């Protein structure tokens, strides 16, 4: 058990039959009445975000999340196969379970698979990935360097906005948290 007074961003807790990650919190001490903690929580199973208020000093159960380094192997129909780097055990996760992560997953990529009481609840990607551009309009000579962009499709099928100088075959460094272009690889 952990006191809500000890909340930190990124802490995982078990409340209301769900596993939640603390995204944001604020200790509030009104002039009248007792203090409380206002928090913003993300459900690790569904991805839903909820705001919840706790009384100051209230105790909640801390959820112990196990992180295992795994390697993404391949897609098998709608399922995706990962291999544990230590035990070489393989697990399959359905495609709808991965959501946005599919935009960045490529064969042999190392990821962190998160589980709670042996139930897989998420896949954490590296902060950046390098993906090759498979389709984009050619840059025209004389294009300005004033931040103009065009769309490009990378090897996973994900489409993003890139600067005009990016060409097919270029390798891009992409931020996995928001899907934005960082640089050429």
Swiss-Prot record:
The cross-references to Pfam families, in alphabetical order and at most eight, read: EFP, EFP_N, Elong-fact-P_C
Q: Name one GO cellular component term.
A: cytoplasm
Instruction: Tell me the keywords, alphabetical order.
Output: Cytoplasm, Elongation factor, Protein biosynthesis
Instruction: Please identify the protein, giving its name as recorded.
Output: Elongation factor P
| Family under the similarity heading | Belongs to the elongation factor P family.
Q: What is its main location?
A: cytoplasm
Biological-process GO terms, alphabetical:
peptide biosynthetic process
Pathway given in the UniProt record: Protein biosynthesis; polypeptide chain elongation
CDD domains in the record, alphabetically?
S1_EF-P_repeat_1 (cd04470), S1_EF-P_repeat_2 (cd05794)
A Gene Ontology molecular function term of the record: translation elongation factor activity
State the compartments where it is located.
Cytoplasm
Q: What does this protein do?
A: Involved in peptide bond synthesis. Stimulates efficient translation and peptide-bond synthesis on native or reconstituted 70S ribosomes in vitro. Probably functions indirectly by altering the affinity of the ribosome for aminoacyl-tRNA, thus increasing their reactivity as acceptors for peptidyl transferase.
Name the source organism: Staphylococcus epidermidis (strain ATCC 35984 / DSM 28319 / BCRC 17069 / CCUG 31568 / BM 3577 / RP62A)
Please indicate if the UniProt record lists Repeat as a keyword: no
Q: Which PANTHER family match?
A: ELONGATION FACTOR P, ELONGATION FACTOR P (EF-P) FAMILY PROTEIN
């Amino acid at each position: 058990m952990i006191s809500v007074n000890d909340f930190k961003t990124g802490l995982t807790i078990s409340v209301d039959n769900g596993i939640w990650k603390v995204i944001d919190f604020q200790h509030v001490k009104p002039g009248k009445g007792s203090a409380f903690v206002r928090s913003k929580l993300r459900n690790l199973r569904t991805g839903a975000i909820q705001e919840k208020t706790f009384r100051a000093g209230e105790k909640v159960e801390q959820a112990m999340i196990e992180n295992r380094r795994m390697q993404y192997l391949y897609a098998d129909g709608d399922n995706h196969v990962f291999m544990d780097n230590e035990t070489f055990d393989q697990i399959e996760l359905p495609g709808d379970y991965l959501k946005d992560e599919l935009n960045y997953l490529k064969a042999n990529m190392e990821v962190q698979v998160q589980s709670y009481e042996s139930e897989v609840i998420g896949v954490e990607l590296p902060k950046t990935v390098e993906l090759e551009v498979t389709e984009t309009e050619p840059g025209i000579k004389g294009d300005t360097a004033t931040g103009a962009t065009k769309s490009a499709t990378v090897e996973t099928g994900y489409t993003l906005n890139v600067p005009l100088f990016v060409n097919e075959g270029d390798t891009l460094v992409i931020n996995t948290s928001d899907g934005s272009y960082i640089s050429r690889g």
